[in-house]
């Protein structure tokens, strides 16, 4: 589906093959869109007393998530090109950089962030007028990135990220899963659910990010096994059948 709807052609290095997302984003997004459609249907039924069909396809979902690249093509037949190191199609610098040990991301989405980065790095070459605006930096992107590469390779990623954070410049590490779940922020959000599974033993998984009102994630239980609740469901069905029909039902 990612190939059919153009996602893969937009993803990957310019000189590499088309690339799919590391996650099954079309499937996940289809579920999210379906939940929104169902909620809209339930809300409408509560107001009007009428049910409705929810017509949803993964193809439509994937097309809708093309967002601005789709608008650019449909309006002006401008096709977004792939850019090296996951860089932004128009903002510079906004991409991956290699430190002495690991990769990290810097994203200067506003001029103030570029100015802070330029001042932090202190390299006279960055003060050239050819780098003074979004347009000029994009025009001279290759030269600018070459300078930044020369600078960033001299320190470890964690050193750079500490300095960038102090100056409030948008940036972040490229984490593996161990680093993701060792992070204090992930722990503080209580997103990990641990439980005893009847056949698999102790299992941990990530919870839903939906946390509204008086919801309490501690009360969440595991998914049932196949046919685990059959008797319970049948008993509820029998109770429902035996109850007299109420008006308006």
Please tell me what each predicted stretch does.
Residues 92-167, 171:
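Aromatic-enriched alpha-helical interface/lid elements that frame and gate functional surfaces
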Residues 166-218:
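A glycine-rich dinucleotide-binding beta-alpha-beta segment and adjacent secondary-structure elements
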Residues 1-104, 108-109:
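Active-site-adjacent "lid/gating" segments in soluble enzymes
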Residues 84-89, 94-95, 139, 200-203, ...:
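Short Gly/Pro-enriched turn/cap motifs at secondary-structure boundaries
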Residues 132, 200-238:
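Flexible, small-/acidic-enriched active-site or ligand-binding loops
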């Amino acid at each position: 589906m990612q190939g059919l709807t153009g996602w893969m052609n937009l993803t990957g290095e310019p000189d590499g093959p088309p690339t799919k997302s590391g996650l099954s984003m079309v499937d996940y997004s289809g579920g999210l869109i379906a939940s929104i459609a169902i909620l809209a249907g339930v809300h409408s039924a509560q107001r009007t007393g009428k049910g409705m069909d929810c017509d949803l396809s993964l193809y439509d979902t994937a097309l809708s998530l093309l967002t601005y690249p789709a608008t650019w093509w449909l309006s002006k037949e401008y096709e977004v090109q792939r850019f090296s190191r996951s860089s932004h199609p128009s903002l510079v610098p906004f991409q991956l950089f290699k430190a002495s040990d690991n990769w990290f991301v810097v994203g200067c989405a506003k001029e103030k962030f570029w100015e802070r980065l330029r001042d932090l790095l202190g390299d006279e070459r960055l003060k050239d007028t050819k780098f003074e605006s979004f347009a000029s930096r994009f025009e001279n992107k290759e030269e600018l990135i070459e300078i930044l590469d020369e600078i960033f390779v001299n320190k470890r990623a964690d050193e750079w990220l500490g300095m960038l954070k102090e100056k409030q410049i948008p940036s972040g590490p490229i984490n593996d899963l161990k680093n993701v779940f060792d992070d204090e922020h992930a722990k503080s959000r209580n997103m990990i659910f641990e439980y005893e599974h009847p056949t698999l033993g102790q299992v941990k998984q990530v919870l839903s990010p939906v946390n509204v009102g008086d919801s309490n994630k501690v009360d969440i239980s595991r998914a049932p096994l196949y046919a685990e609740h059959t008797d319970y469901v049948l008993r509820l069905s029998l109770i429902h059948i035996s109850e007299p029909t109420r008006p308006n039902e």
